[in-house]
Amino acid sequence: MNTFALLSVFIQACLVQSVFSQCTSRAAVAADRGIIGGYGFGAPCGLAGGYGLEAPYGWAGYADYGYPAGAYGIDAYGGIGEGNVAVAGELPVAGTTAVAGQVPIMGAVKFGGDVCAAGSVSIAGKCACGCGDYGYGYGLGAPYLY
């Protein structure tokens, strides 16, 4: 009887953990003082705020003031190669995404289904997708700004 009771407690603990680990809404993540709330990642002094990662003097460099992030330092890897990325399921994203460096995309990008997006995107750099001289070295490839 003692072994059965102990096994029963372990099974109940696993069931309780399974029940309470399910994500039912974004309420806990996007709460007032959560990740994107008052004092979280998106706050005025957080990662995406006025003094954080995305700030003019943050990790994204001084690009807004005419000084690119990797102009005189070590630049990012060129990314010449081939790879496949497949994503299935829902991708709920809330907050700010800052990408510093190179994001090479060669080939086709296809979305199936509804893609709801709001906000703005600005891309500045060199094109490695066939416009210009391939963008494989310093000064090659036509610069662009969207």
UniProtKB/Swiss-Prot annotation:
Q: Which GO terms describe its cellular component?
A: egg chorion
Q: Which UniProt keywords apply?
A: Repeat, Signal
Keyword Transcription (UniProt): no
**GO BP term, example:** chorion-containing eggshell formation
GO molecular function: any one?
A: structural constituent of egg chorion
Q: Which positions carry the signal peptide feature in this UniProt record?
A: 1-21
Q: Which domain of life is it from?
A: Eukaryota
Record's function text: This protein is one of many from the eggshell of the gypsy moth.
Q: Which family does it belong to?
A: Belongs to the chorion protein family.
Annotated protein name in UniProt: Chorion class A protein Ld3/Ld29
Q: Write down the species.
A: Lymantria dispar
